[in-house]
């Protein structure tokens, strides 16, 4: 299985120079890297498909009855758009992950700070500059990430046992983090369901979804940890100045969160595959970090607010290669500056009727993209970038990101042979 573009280590990394693992073999310098087993029978996408089946089986075994009730409540009471059973299962696993990982961090922030941050996000009676300065000051003082602890692949993040009455505070905290806000909708729905139960039953269900995540952390580390060996090095290398970065929660994700994003993308693709194939029009949206050396001068890179397409100016550009690869499929390739602005992305592309959209994005950003497109009722398939290559969040010097060309063709056309 090849990748669209070159492998791209180029001696510059998110952390430093290329490192050597305990076996003496060189390790990828990136936070995650999906190319490590490229070309082997046990490639990333095959391993992911197998593990995703295991995850769904485990959720059915541990929480099948809860899943039944969650789906029924969302569709009949909350009037949510129907989703596949697999996607609903991932909602439960996400609730377990978010409450376990971020419950303690949220609890350290006073409620008044969260209220003020939310007010400042929409306040109109102050000048924009003043509002922004006040919000930035509160954000920097209270919304901090934990620094300095090395988290190895096999290490399980300590679980925070979430009480049901603590969920509203966690939801407000998530909405203030910028990069974790996509999880708040699922927690809001989950809290609404728990409030229909007796206190003891609600506590039991809360503990059971956290138990699911406990199992997932260990199982995913064994199945997918090979692809996220760089996470622990990256987290350990962060400095105190990290807490002045607006993207600190994006950069601070644990290995288990990357694994969860991998499985969620796979399950989401399965759930929408048939609807996507029925769409008469196909689009592919790739991030600007895939552009080549001529990106700053490319006519296709000067959009002036219009949709950006490849002009074929640079034969070595990964966007050009993806465009050429899909030439016969009639799928049009467009560029987005960064899918991190997923709400804007969804607002723009959800206006395209009867259109299936393939979105390529970094795994750290993928959950936000999935949540935004799901809320916008878009028919999508999701392709993770092979590694995060942008200078804005990860690297000292940008390295053009790549994507797996076989998987891209499979998602768009269904022509690649791979186990469903």
Residue ranges and their predicted role:
Residues 1-279:
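Long, compositionally biased, glycine/small-hydrophobic-enriched stretches that function as flexible linkers
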Residues 263, 285-287, 334-340, 358-363:
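Short His-Asn-centered micro-motif
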Residues 258-269, 311-320, 405-406:
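Well-ordered, non-membrane alpha-helical segments in soluble/globular domains
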Residues 339-350, 364-368:
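A short, acidic, amphipathic alpha-helical segment used as a generic capping/interface helix at domain edges
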Residues 272-333:
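Redox- and metal-dependent alpha/beta enzyme cores, enriched for Fe-S-associated oxidoreductases
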Residues 353-355:
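Proline-aspartate-enriched helix->loop->beta-strand connector
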Residues 360-420:
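C-terminal functional extensions of proteins
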Residues 299-305, 350-351, 373-377:
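Short, solvent-exposed amphipathic alpha-helical segments in soluble enzyme
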